[in-house]
Amino acid sequence: MLQRVILIVLDSVGVGELPDAYKFGDKGTNTLGHVVEKTGIKLPTMEKLGLGNIIPLKTVAPNPNAIGAYGKMAEKSAGKDTTTGHWEIAGLIVEKPFPTYPEGFPKEIIEEFEKRIGRKVLGNKPASGTEIIKELGEEHIKTGYPIVYTSADSVFQIAAHEEVIPLEELYRMCEIAREILKGDHAVGRVIARPFIGSPGNFVRTANRRDFSLKPFGPTVLDMLKEAGYQVYAVGKIEDIFAGQGITDSVHTGNNDEGITATIEAMDAVKKGIIFTNLVDFDMVYGHRNDVNGYAKALKHFDERLPEIMLRLKEEDLLIITADHGCDPTTPGTDHTREYVPLLVYSPSMKEGRNLGLRKTYADVAATIAEIFNVGPIHTGTSFLRELPLKVGV
């Protein structure tokens, strides 16, 4: 019987526009396809698993002898953000999109926030995080006022220089914002965005922290935890689920740390799930339209993936997917509404398998629920029985 699932989310690595992408301004987007096309990178490990069988990729070939199961998944939820994507992977469909603020946050929200933190704020508009600290960083240093901004996603972001507003105080401000932002203004995430440096040379640090809404219903993580299984969160997973359904967690500063932490978790978890988010694709490269950086990050993951695969036992199942797109070749810097890849591998698989087009990310949750005999997850369809696993596993 399968005993462990290693679930890795390559944050923002979408594989082509969803049929309704035009409604989100994302017609023609294809994060992975465009990055591969522009850079000519090769991804031999994921090619071996069947990545090139999911969509046509210029320099990643289809593999008739793929050792993994492969397919792509559509997002059923109404959105294209991190919280929505991860919650759906865990079995929760978000039918009403989280609120967004293209004109900035309402006066009453900002006034309440300023009153609670005891100081004014700067910004209060949609902006790129790197651009707004360039624009307002110097004024922030002079005044001590935090920079509040949003994006096309449902986020309330607070940027502050670590020497002006210490991290613990910034995190406290985020907790205050999280308390205020409820009801009609229940944004998906409040995000701390600390930075360092001097005017003209500001750099965001790895001390970002996300303060998510609590999931509005049970996820497969809750079901696993209640049944006594380990749920080991790596990266920002604990934040995305507001700690719900998590038994152990480690926060990481970048993809490399996330991969290493996943490998270390494989020594700590005997029965249960390791759930990893690798954020650099999205945060460092996608939102900054850095195509070459995105390609290097994909290549680096592909080069380190064998370290994980070689540690897999017959009772382990590896699932690699994504939560949305963030096509760095588009003029915009926001997430894109795309299909996500699905790669599944176990040493106990006899051959590769085409898992086709899945109607929802929640198929991952349904599969995990079936493996551990929890649930059921009614929002998705398990693909466990479609996997060519050896008898008795």
Curated annotation (Swiss-Prot):
Residues annotated to bind Mn(2+) 1: D11, D323, H324
Signal peptide limits: none
Subcellular location: Cytoplasm
Keyword vocabulary terms for this entry: Cytoplasm, Isomerase, Manganese, Metal-binding
Cited Pfam families: Metalloenzyme
UniProt pathway: Carbohydrate degradation; 2-deoxy-D-ribose 1-phosphate degradation; D-glyceraldehyde 3-phosphate and acetaldehyde from 2-deoxy-alpha-D-ribose 1-phosphate: step 1/2
Domain of life: Bacteria
MF annotations from Gene Ontology: magnesium ion binding; manganese ion binding; phosphopentomutase activity
SUPFAM superfamilies found in the cross-reference section: Alkaline phosphatase-like (SSF53649), DeoB insert domain-like (SSF143856)
Record keyword Manganese present: yes
UniProt remark on cofactor binding: Binds 2 manganese ions.
Family of the protein in this entry: Belongs to the phosphopentomutase family.
Protein name as annotated: Phosphopentomutase
Source lineage: Bacteria, Bacillati, Bacillota, Clostridia, Thermoanaerobacterales
Gene name of this polypeptide: deoB
